[in-house]
C-alpha cells in the first residue's frame, strides 16, 4: 500500500477491542461499537501557514492514538479498512 496523506492528515488503522468482557461474556458483532483507538500507518508533511511555513505533524508512524467517535473518514485500500483524519481529530497518544 502506498498512500501518503497530504498536509496534516493522518492514516490510521483501527485497533479492534476485546470481544469478551471481564466477566467472560462474548459481545456479538452487532452490539459492538467501532473502536476509538488506532495505530498510525502514515503521516502527512504538516500544515502550511498563510506565509508558506510548514508546521510539522507531532505524531509518527506506529503511535497508538485515541480519537473521537465520529472522527475521520472511513476508506478501504487493498481490502483493508483505514481512517483518514486531521491531526486535530487525535485526542491523545497512548503510551
Swiss-Prot record:
Asked if Chaperone is a keyword of the record, the answer is: yes
What keywords tag this UniProt record? Chaperone, Cytoplasm
What InterPro entries does this protein map onto? Chaperonin_GroES, Chaperonin_GroES_sf, Chaprnonin_Cpn10_CS, GroES-like_sf
UniProt GO MF annotations: ATP binding; metal ion binding; protein folding chaperone; protein-folding chaperone binding; unfolded protein binding
Gene Ontology BP terms: chaperone cofactor-dependent protein refolding
Question: Pfam family of this protein, just one?
Answer: Cpn10
> Would you tell me the Gene Ontology cellular component terms?
cytoplasm
Entry keyword annotation includes Hydrolase: no
Q: Where in the cell is it found?
A: Cytoplasm
* Principal localisation: cytoplasm
Q: Which family does it belong to?
A: Belongs to the GroES chaperonin family.
Q: What is annotated about its quaternary structure and interactions?
A: Heptamer of 7 subunits arranged in a ring. Interacts with the chaperonin GroEL.
PANTHER family, alphabetized? 10 KDA HEAT SHOCK PROTEIN, CO-CHAPERONIN GROES
Q: What does this protein do?
A: Together with the chaperonin GroEL, plays an essential role in assisting protein folding. The GroEL-GroES system forms a nano-cage that allows encapsulation of the non-native substrate proteins and provides a physical environment optimized to promote and accelerate protein folding. GroES binds to the apical surface of the GroEL ring, thereby capping the opening of the GroEL channel.
Q: Which HAMAP family match?
A: CH10
Identify this protein by name.
Co-chaperonin GroES
Name the species this protein comes from.
Geobacter sulfurreducens (strain ATCC 51573 / DSM 12127 / PCA)
Amino acid at each position: 500500500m502506498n498512500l501518503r496523506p497530504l498536509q496534516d492528515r493522518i492514516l490510521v488503522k483501527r485497533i479492534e477491542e476485546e470481544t469478551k468482557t471481564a466477566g467472560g461474556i462474548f459481545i456479538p458483532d452487532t452490539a459492538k461499537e467501532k473502536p476509538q483507538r488506532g495505530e498510525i500507518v502514515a503521516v502527512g508533511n504538516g500544515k502550511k501557514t498563510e506565509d508558506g511555513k510548514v508546521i510539522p505533524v507531532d505524531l509518527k508512524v506506529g503511535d497508538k492514538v485515541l480519537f473521537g467517535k465520529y472522527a475521520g473518514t472511513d476508506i478501504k485500500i487493498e481490502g483493508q479498512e483505514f481512517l483518514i483524519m486531521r491531526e486535530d481529530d487525535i485526542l491523545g497518544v497512548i503510551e
